[in-house]
Swiss-Prot record:
Keywords: ATP-binding, Helicase, Hydrolase, Multifunctional enzyme, Nucleotide-binding, Nucleotidyltransferase, RNA-directed RNA polymerase, Transferase, Viral RNA replication. This is RNA replication protein. Pfam families: RdRP_2. One of its GO terms (biological process) is viral RNA genome replication. It comes from Chrysanthemum virus B. Residues 40-147 form the RdRp catalytic domain. The keyword Transferase applies. GO terms for molecular function: ATP binding; ATP hydrolysis activity; RNA binding; RNA helicase activity; RNA-directed RNA polymerase activity.
Amino acid sequence: PYMRYIEAKLHEVLPSRFYIHSGKGLEELNEWVIKGKFEGICTESDYEAFDASQDQYIVAFELALMEYLGLPRDLIEDYAFIKCHLGSKLGNFAIMRFSGEASTFLFNTMANMLFTFLRYNIKDSEHICFAGDDMCASERLCIKKEHEGFLNKLKLKAKVFFVDKPTFCGWHLCPDGIYKKPQLVLERMCIAKEKNNLANCLDNYAIEVSYAYKLGERAVNRMDEEELEAAYNCVRIIIKNKKLLKSDILGFYSNIEKQI
C-alpha cells in the first residue's frame, strides 16, 4: 500500500506533458503522443547497466522522498538497512537494484526522471514519457552543466540518441499516434509458434498490430522495406490464425479479411 501511495502522489503532481507508462492503456498512450506531436528530431535515452547503477545516491533520493511523503520511520529505516546489508557467503553486495525488490518499476522510473531533469534544460514545450529506464522526449533536449558535478558521481550513465523516428517501449511515436515495431511483433509471433503458445498471446499481438493498420499510409510512409514486410507478415499470420482470437479484436481482422 505504501508503494501505491507514493505512485498516487507522483501522478497527483505530474504535469500532463509528462507521462509514466504504468497502469495505462495503449489508447491513453496513443492520445498523449498525438497531443505531444512527436515530429522532427526527438531525444531517446537508454542507460548502461541500469539496475547495477542504482547506487547510494539513488537510495538517498528514495529515502528523502519517503520522508517527505511521511512514510513510517521504521519502514524507512528497514528499507535503508536492507539496501545496505544484502550479502552472500562470498561477502556483501554493492548497493544496486535487485530483481524482486519492492516497487522496482516505480523507483527505476523516478530515478530515470531525476536524472533527466538534472541532465537536460527542460522548458515548457517538451512532452516526455518515462517507463523504468526508458525515456523519450518530443524535442531535441539541450544538456545543462548546472548539476554536472553531482551527475559525475553517479554510476548512472545515459546513452542518448537524437532521432527522427522516436521509439518508446517498442512503440514508434509519431504525430499521428503510435504503432508497434513490426519486426519485434513478428519475432515474438514466430517464437510463440515454435513453442506452440500462439493461442495464448495472439490477442495481444493482434491488438498491437492493429495500431499500424489503422494508421494506414501514415504508418507505411514511415516504414522501411524490412518493416513493411514484417507488418504484412504479422497481419497475414493473424488472419490465418484468427480462429484463435478470443477478444473483440476478432471483428477488426474479420473486416480486413472481407476487404482482401
